[in-house]
């Protein structure tokens, strides 16, 4: 079984407005596909005769066997070897030409890519020159970019096995023949328009042959299943299996199809590019989640990172079922992110691309205390995990989450701890820490003396507790105080201002307490807030109060009885 895809008008489609004007009739496309099924041996090269050319001279210059000039004469129906008319056209079968072998250059290697077959040798590196027959395996996480000729490149994704087939040309006339055997995996080819119509660029899978003359075309193969996606240009597709009628169709720009064996699926329009406006252009974390909005019809996403906008230097390649991905495992640098959505047939849509700068080092430390949402009472420290090899830190505290209203900006801070300022008024604060660069650690992407600030944490400085003057009533002593609401408070009552032996020492809820009237004398009372984790605030200033001695009330005599006692005196 063999299927060949032939570029049908890619050069026209590269001109402005050509996409709307190019309407290849189905018959013409299928004819092209059928013609393409004939091997290179049946194809011809048309030579424009130059002044002074002869059949013998042309044969000596171009033919693999110069003695075939009489056959060339008969093919072109020429009567004798006389000087040919300048500007006339001479037909020459491609398999008569004198081909010379070319090489392909390894432009980029990511991860480990190894050669396959006899004499495979060490892992491949950039700059290697490859010849026809060289095979390779990108492994689970490797990627490879080959430069073939005149800007034509092919990028092979992870888990790809392929080999170079034909790599040849005819010197002096610009006829080239390139074939890549894609056994499994995926290839993304960018083919510059071939100058000579007799030139061929083919990628063959176990079931499909794709031939282009200048287009952006993606292929993937896994067993009998293959996927074909035309980004620019137009192609004709014919699937042929011995003993069966050919299956034929056409693919236009922004179309794709899925083939199973020789059976070609119905062409469908590729999904549009995703919206990458929400992808950050600057990343300051070694692991950063990125995402795109869901896309109608999408059932998967293909993410790639490269060091160049053309994606010839592929660094990462991964697929996810959801429109989110984690960028990680990259050194600081400038990168390009590319994502495309895949439909139910796993046909991948148009690219969406976003450049970003990764500036994540030196990494900020992890904040330990106060944690986000914590309450602070009394003297407290800000504490963070100590980063390895960190010479010092920069600490910022602000009243706002954007750190525009700073109350503290201190550097260098040596060690993983800094005391809070006791003068900060009650309220909410935000704090964060950055690691300073070591001396001489200014790399090519270092910006300033420090790395990025870490994620900030929010804490609240609670107001101090204040004890109100106690009120002594006939039913006891009434205590009230002000302080942070929603917390318990500890109350101490003592007869000495040192509170060495308090008569009352308990934690109570709320901001009010009623006690029985103690024995007469002087007393001192104070309070402190108690947080749920057991931490306590500062003691309030003690309040002193006096419980007076009890005074005997005068006796009361009945007035009538008093008058009776006074009668004898009258």
What are these model-predicted stretches?
Residues 61-101:
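Extracellular LysM carbohydrate-binding repeats and other cell-envelope/extracellular binding modules
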Residues 345-358, 436-461, 533-547:
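Extracellular fibronectin type III
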Residues 86-89, 94-286, 565:
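Flexible, surface-exposed loop/linker segments and immediately adjacent secondary-structure boundaries
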